[in-house]
């Protein structure tokens, strides 16, 4: 199996979650060993996708360089990871990726339009060799060795609609599209009101998020899945783990995980080369892994 990029450039326009302004997103092919590179066309700044370039994880994953940032990258990255794309230029003309409907479904459709093409250099993946855990009180995120890739997530909210939800994704591209991609981000009405008072979440609406008051979901169409909340947490986790820089084989597990804990997990993983092994997908032993991205 070889490294990939997209067949042709594609673009879309959507609303930025925090500023509420229109943002154009454009994806362009890159050659082998380029990696994923974000580019802000409004200020002519390129920001490679690296854990060291993460500058904020409070409400979204934010990367930055030389004082310029790009926010809310995790939904876009989640789709890119699920499609197994290794090399891509991601261009925005503002300081955030458009939120679209709050899921990664629009980005999956954009990648379907672009198409995926193999290049001339073997694809590299990371095999997790040791268990790595980052814990804060009851909350934790963990990676452990496995022969495949699973994402398991548990959330607990003192809300009658959410309560405790658990989900395990046996990762393949198709399973991701069927089970995860349409799950939307969510928030509580009192949080949205507070953020807007601070000049944030100006683009947030029932069109791009699940919003809950103290008792119910306010979106008139309801939920896409009964457990849409935990499914979206897996969507976020996949996007955050893309900061590793390549697809990996191992189990991801989280209890009340967050962007911040996911970032700390990638740093903990990468700080010791004994934690992982980078392998090239070049022989019969890797055929099963290829099926995941078919």
Curated annotation (Swiss-Prot):
Signal peptide residues are none
Q: Name one GO cellular component term.
A: membrane
| Annotated EC | 3.5.1.108
Which regions span the lipid bilayer? none
Q: Name one GO molecular function term.
A: UDP-3-O-acyl-N-acetylglucosamine deacetylase activity
Where, in this chain's numbering, is Zn(2+) bound?
Answer: 75, 232, 236
* Reactions accelerated catalytically: a UDP-3-O-[(3R)-3-hydroxyacyl]-N-acetyl-alpha-D-glucosamine + H2O = a UDP-3-O-[(3R)-3-hydroxyacyl]-alpha-D-glucosamine + acetate
Cross-referenced InterPro entries: Ribosomal_Su5_D2-typ_SF, UDP-acyl_GlcNac_deAcase, UDP-acyl_GlcNac_deAcase_C, UDP-acyl_N-AcGlcN_deAcase_N
**A biological process term (GO) from this entry:** lipid A biosynthetic process
Give the protein's biological function.
Answer: Catalyzes the hydrolysis of UDP-3-O-myristoyl-N-acetylglucosamine to form UDP-3-O-myristoylglucosamine and acetate, the committed step in lipid A biosynthesis.
Q: What is this protein called?
A: UDP-3-O-acyl-N-acetylglucosamine deacetylase
């Amino acid at each position: 199996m070889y490294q990939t990029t997209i067949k042709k450039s594609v673009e879309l326009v959507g609303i930025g979650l925090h500023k509420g302004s229109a943002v154009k997103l454009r994806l362009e092919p890159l050659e082998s060993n380029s990696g994923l590179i974000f580019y802000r066309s409004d200020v002519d700044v390129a920001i490679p996708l690296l854990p060291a370039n993460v500058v904020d994880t409070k409400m979204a994953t934010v990367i930055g360089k030389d004082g310029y940032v790009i926010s809310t990258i995790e939904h876009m990255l989640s789709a890119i990871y699920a499609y197994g794309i290794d090399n891509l230029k991601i261009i925005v003309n503002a300081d955030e990726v458009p939120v679209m409907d709050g899921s990664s479904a629009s980005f999956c459709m954009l990648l379907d339009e672009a198409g995926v093409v193999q290049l001339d250099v073997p694809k590299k993946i990371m095999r997790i060799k040791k268990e790595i855990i980052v814990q804060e009180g009851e909350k934790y995120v963990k990676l452990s060795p496995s022969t495949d890739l699973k994402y398991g997530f548990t959330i607990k909210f003192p809300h009658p609609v959410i309560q405790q939800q658990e989900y395990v994704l046996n990762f393949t591209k198709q399973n991701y599209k069927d089970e995860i991609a349409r799950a939307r981000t969510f928030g509580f009405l009192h949080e949205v009101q507070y953020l807007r008072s601070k000049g944030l979440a100006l683009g947030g609406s029932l069109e791009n998020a699940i919003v809950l008051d103290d008792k119910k979901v306010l979106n008139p169409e309801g939920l896409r899945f009964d457990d849409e909340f935990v499914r979206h947490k897996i969507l976020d986790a996949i996007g955050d783990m893309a900061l590793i820089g390549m697809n990996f084989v191992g189990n991801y597990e989280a209890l009340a995980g967050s962007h911040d804990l996911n970032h700390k997990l990638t740093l903990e993983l990468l700080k010791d080369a004994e934690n992982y092994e980078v392998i090239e997908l070049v022989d019969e032993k890797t055929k099963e892994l290829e099926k995941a991205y078919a």
